[in-house]
């Protein structure tokens, strides 16, 4: 295999603990909107709904604005809350998502260790308002070389169109010299395969992968990315 010259990092669930940010943001918004207590059971219910809506986006069934509001509309209807509050709730939620910054284990150390050795980019399907705040508050916007947010790019992972500006920006680095690291099989790994990029599935939970998806690497600890990069240079 070719030497890895660029690492493309997914953000939510790979570099940053999305579930921690999600939990804090929802609880804050429930309080701000006077919706009462948001229990852990309610957050788990919302999280499952949210995953389904994002997967529908990846399949091209809805637009980004539709899924952002639709997930809360469905959740509120299921909880007996007026769904009409969903648009305003989502707008505040996007702002609050960047309030809580928790790095996934060894993510910060790995990004720091790779600085100057390979090009490092964020490749994320999140919204611009949420991701800009997260990247700034975490310091990742100053550690990574380039940032690619689907809302700005105009395409979502796993679409090959998402990666077109990534390739253009990285110039002489070939797709096979890039490694995409992410926790999502449907957006990160499928996206990397679609674009001809080497793939690394971050799988800390030890989940089974579907046989039709053949990723190049599977890791349980982000620190393993450093080993993969070093091994490729030998």
Where are these regions (language model features)?
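N-terminal helical cap/lid subdomain that shapes the substrate entry/recognition surface
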Residues: 2-105
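Asp-based, Mg2+/Mn2+-dependent phosphohydrolase catalytic module
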Residues: 1-7, 20, 41, 108, ...
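N-terminal start-of-chain detector that recognizes signal peptides
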Residues: 71, 76, 92-95, 119-122, ...
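Glycine-centered loop/turn motif at secondary-structure junctions
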Residues: 34, 80, 117-118, 139, ...
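Structured helix-beta-strand junction loops
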Residues: 49, 116-117
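Alpha-helical structural context
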Residues: 32-33, 78, 117, 169-170, ...
